Amino acid sequence: MNYWEPVDGEDPELATAADGTSVVVQERFPSARVVKSLNQLGYHELDEHHRPNGAPDRIAVGAAGDDRLAVREVMRLVDRLGFDPVDVGPLENGLALEPDGSPFAATYTADELSRLVAR
């Protein structure tokens, strides 16, 4: 999730989440299989930029999570939706996909996104 106070209401814990909002969600629901993905692009980009597998202009969507099986499942979904999935590692790495992260609201190839989140 991306925390937006005007939409989500005031939540100081989410507003100051040093490891990202999805880590807070995982802590609140410890038995959930939380994967942060499909949040770095807006709905219009998801609609406009999906491409078939192998297309040279296919863009990447990151997936972060501590449950590796759940991450793989989400990555398969991302691929079926028409994007190149990029495993960005544990859930705390999903912070890079949030509004202050450089991949947010930008289109990158899988290689470019991998390099951005590896920093």
Task: Annotate the PLM regions.
Residues M1-P52:
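Rossmann-fold NAD(P)-binding glycine/threonine-rich loop
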Residues P56-R119:
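Active-site-lining helix/loop region of Rossmann-like oxidoreductase modules
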